[in-house]
């Protein structure tokens, strides 16, 4: 029987002590506070916090910004905060509803602001794992929206995590109190969180390694 390659608890404790807690930024939701995609985003970040990560969330009206215009040099406070948090992020979670088979303009416009990061040492989402969560009322919409979202992450040089979560909004997975009541959905979001945090740890570990000299 093959031996397990899962890190031992002692190894995980040493890893946590040696490297800083990863900072995971979540963006998504709709203009309606408490939407399924917003609640899914917050639940995913809660799982990430349970794994020792620090988190920040941008959703609902926090994503309402002027249409991105590369020719305009001034930025609103919301846009500045978005870009600054993404610059600091070690990992990212994006939770999107499906609007007519794709991501909504609200989210796409927010992602367009990453163009302000094009000249950074880590441009766009470079070097960051990105977990994708899609909420829709139909299987077809889930598939097309997830494909679009993962394609955008690729275009921004991010690493979409191997696992992405798809949630059927019509099943009402969250109760009136905003808490998850479907274990299968919770398991999906936990997997996304685990992969984002794990890859963020790997990235932090690589940065801490001595760089070869000429």
Q: Language model features by range: what are they?
A:
Residues 60-77, 173-177:
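N-terminal beta-loop-helix "entrance" segment that forms/cooperates
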Residues 2-25, 159-214:
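Glycine-rich phosphate/pyrophosphate-binding loop and the adjoining helix
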